[in-house]
Amino acid sequence: MPGRAARRRISSPAVSRRLALAALAGLAVLVVLAGLALPAPEAAAARPGCDPIDPAHCLLPWPNDHFRKNGRIALRDSQMPRNKDGRPVRAADYNRSDGFSPGQMIVTRVPGLDLKRSRAVPVDDLARSFAKRAPIVVIDARTGERQLIWAELDAQATNPRKRALLVHPAANWREGHRYVVALRNLKDRRGRTLQPDRAFRRLRDGERSTERYRDIFGRLAKAGIRRRTLYRAWDFTIASRRSLSQRLLSIRDRAFAELGDTTTGDLQVQGGAPAFTVDGVSQLTPDVKRVDGTFTVPCFLDAPGCPPGARFRLDRGGLPVRTPGNVQVERFICLVPDGAANGRPLLFGHGLLGGAEAVLDLAPLAAISNFVTCATDWSGMSSEDLPNVLDLSRDISKFPSLADRLQQGFVNFMFLGRLMIHPDGFASRPEFAGKIDTRRLFFAGASQGGVLGGALTAVAPDFERSALIVPAMNFSLLLARSTQFGRFADVLYPSYPDQIERQLLVSMVQMLWDRGEANGYAWHMTRDPYPGTPRHTVLLHEAFGDHQVANVATEVEARVIGARLRTPALDPGRSRDRRPYYRIPRIRSLPYSGNAMVVFDIGPLRTGGLGTPASPLANIAQTRGTDPHSITATAPAAAIQFSEFLKLGGTLIDTCSGRPCYAAGWAGPP
């Protein structure tokens, strides 16, 4: 213990000041040392090549032309998200694209943001995209036209400090177009205006200038957006049609050329039929026979037989290289009604990670509507692919194997379809002879079969009419909103624990997934057909409140393909939206021969758990009530619609007596 003299010396003002200064100096040293040991979040954006305007992650804001150079995506492995083992996602596959996805989800981080106080456009009021003072705006850089969008905070994130702002296109971005994003006058929960980070503030206020940002600010000014109001702004460019489709169109054309058909798209069967075998026939029901067999398809992946996990090997032009003689032998299952005479050939696509056996559920429809219905596995997303899907959820660098095998799967489906209408195909066998009308093929796909079936429809040479049942597009939009996502999130989320990176990853992989699902081909599904491809007409069937395939994604697809809505779609008050089905035009009269969307409803939540509420506004799945996903398509009114649409000269007819279309025993409000 110090004596009284010592205590007096310590308590003197001069000594106290010296001790205080020493303590502060020591504290400063500790802070510096701590900073060296644990970098602040802003350090991520300070790495070489990062965009400093969003310090939450090197690649934010995303998508972003900061990461596009000389007309190509230009990412580095060092910038990419890392899994729990420290392995970065490999950038090479992304760098083969000349732009971002047509459905690319915008991801950025805005600390303290309150979307309601900011009056940002929500998913249930899309018209606010065009409000004069909208705080979140996306414009076409060339025309200045506002884009239809909605904004949300990531409800999947449990850490508020890692909660990303997500902005979705409510009608896809156009191929090859450049867009500018503007965040302005953003508010916190107390209504205070948020201030930008230093890096963007310097650009905005003219302390630092680049040619790119002079152009961005100029285009925003022409669109009526004042520079001084900006919190953050940047640009991004969408991939071209060629970048999105050239691989699939190349393997399609080369595969059919091997059959001797070099003029696909004229709806004329030319050349030979694919090789096939019939391995078994059984009586499935009193009215329908089951026929099992195999067929052979050229394999364009890098392993013999095109197994799960195999990938394209690309040449210098970016096209898949085929190993001479490599083939895939795929199975098929067909349903042949016993009483069929010239039955309509219907190609069917199964649901999530399922298999060809799903076609067996269509036996009643086949018998009643005289459909000869055939299915195969969706290579890339079938039950056989499940181990690969789980494996790539642990290491996203393996994701190209899924997207590449999906494209091989489309060729498989097209070859099965050709067998159904070729005179030397199934019609040459006694199991099918006289029972199949080879004039024209039709397609129906349910759930995943509707998502992948949209892409197939866009490139298919042998059918013109397609029914997509509880479909959508853009897996990056669908995943978090689906009850099916949980089993994959249980693998993905522990592998990528950073909650900001999860949404970034989901958005990023859409660039690869585009080549294997409808999102990458949607602008050509019903109009502006690809070379060697006929024009297609599509019927979309939406189950209101779907727990597995989010209605918002189905409605984005409807806007892109130009589908008109059959009305009345719902009873008054059933939708959560201020203006339901905004910017989806209505069908004026029935019958209707064009692209259409029909909504089926099992009714609101009621006693016994029957019915379902409208989908949640947030990016989470609906778990209350009964899931209508697998119910509505079996409604007699739906089956009759499909049958009348999927025929030569087919149309959408009114099977709902001028009321909303109901299912599962729901007959409408009293």
Give residue ranges: language-model regions.
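A conserved hydrophobic secondary-structure block that centers on an alpha-helix together
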Residues: 159-184, 188-189, 325-363
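Acidic, low-complexity Ser/Thr/Gly/Pro-rich repeat segments typical of extracellular/periplasmic
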Residues: 45-279, 286-298, 305
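C-terminal subdomain of alpha/beta-hydrolase-fold enzymes, centered on the catalytic histidine
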Residues: 405-408, 467-670
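Bacterial N-terminal signal peptides
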Residues: 22-37
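Domain-level recognition of soluble alpha/beta enzyme cores
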Residues: 263-339, 344-345
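Bacterial N-terminal signal peptides that target proteins for export
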Residues: 3-26
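Primarily recognizes the serine-hydrolase "nucleophile elbow" in alpha/beta-hydrolase
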Residues: 419-480
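Cap/lid segment of the alpha/beta-hydrolase catalytic domain
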Residues: 303-330, 341-432
